[in-house]
A protein has these predicted regions:
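Cationic, low-complexity basic patches in intrinsically disordered or flexible, solvent-exposed regions
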Residues: 11
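Glycine-rich phosphate-binding loops of nucleotide-dependent enzymes
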Residues: 18, 23, 27-308
Length: 308
């Protein structure tokens, strides 16, 4: 078989969990490579992609977020930083539908193939609807299926794009057959992008921590996101692993046109890879600007270092 017919020695035609099916059909089905879309939101670079407007979130008498507002611009890496307990993960949970704020809006902008604009308030939608709109996220604590292989975990990330039912998929019939091949091609491209080829058939639970974090990034990419939400993607990594992860995030952003909103505690990484930084402290926004502007913000310095 040629490179177009195989991926690392295995036929591409597989089911959603990677088990080989009907390899004799692969040459006929693979007519072109699936390409990771550039700027799937179709929002022009430099225009607002996500607007957080006066978002407030409370748990009983505890205020996690208080009237937080900022804008994530298409084509940017936007960092959200702050001390522990500042409300950063709560904000990502609101944007991904896990929490519903008591007040405010989280507006996602997009355009269709004809250029017609649409806006969705993520604060009112459930997680599966948000995923279908092109918002994907990773978690601070690894949330992978440890008993499945790397390939199988990434294939599960394609579920939001699957259009055929269980029976056609089981018998590998008609359009379901073509769809399955396309999903596998997409996953293989993500594996290439993140340089995970050597681990593709390994069970995720057996992989090193840094590789597992990369797999989680890959699964989020398999959603085909316009906006990628990353919750401390470098937590627990050593310096070399952080450098690698920063490079992969920049590759996703620069080569694939995916906008990124990330939470990260390593200020060196934040200042190096971010276009814009928003700072939270006790649920309130105390700074928003370029890395240089935030670095010079006295309120930010005080929140991190304390007042004299």
């Amino acid at each position: 078989m040629s490179r177009s017919e195989t991926m690392y020695g295995q036929p591409i035609a597989t089911c959603v969990l990677g088990h080989i099916r009907h390899p004799e059909e692969v040459p006929r089905l693979l007519t072109r490579a699936y390409r990771f879309p550039l700027n799937s939101s179709r929002v022009p670079v430099g225009e607002p992609l996500l607007e957080v407007r006066d978002v407030s979130l409370r748990f009983g008498g505890i205020t996690a977020l208080s009237e937080v507002s900022f804008t994530v611009v298409q084509g940017h890496v936007h960092a959200v930083i702050g001390p522990n307990g500042a409300g950063k993960s709560s904000l990502l949970n609101c944007a991904s539908g896990l929490y519903r704020p008591q007040a405010g809006q989280i507006l996602l902008h997009s355009r269709d193939e004809h250029g017609a604009a649409s806006t969705h308030d993520l604060a009112k939608l459930k997680p599966h609807r948000i995923a279908r709109l092109g918002v994907a996220r990773s978690f601070q604590n690894i949330e992978l299926f440890s008993h499945l292989t790397l390939l199988e975990n990434l294939m599960l990330g394609r579920h939001v794009h699957m259009r055929h039912g269980l029976l056609p998929s089981m018998v590998w019939f008609g359009p379901a057959r073509n769809q399955e091949v396309r999903h596998r091609e997409f996953v293989e491209e993500v594996i290439d992008l993140l340089q995970l080829q050597a681990f593709r058939n390994h069970h995720v639970g057996s992989l090193a921590y840094g590789i597992q974090k990369r797999v989680e990034l890959g699964r989020a990419l398999c959603v085909e996101p316009a906006l990628l939400l990353l919750d401390e993607p470098m937590a627990g990594m050593n310096a070399e692993e952080k450098e690698d992860m920063a490079r992969y995030i920049l590759d996703v952003h620069e080569l694939r046109g995916v906008s990124v909103m990330l939470i990260e505690h390593d200020m060196g990484v934040v200042m190096d890879i971010s276009n814009r930084v928003s700072v939270l402290d006790f649920g309130r926004l105390i700074g928003d600007g370029t890395p240089d502007e935030v670095r010079a913000n006295e309120a930010v310095v005080e929140a991190y270092l304390g007042a004299d």
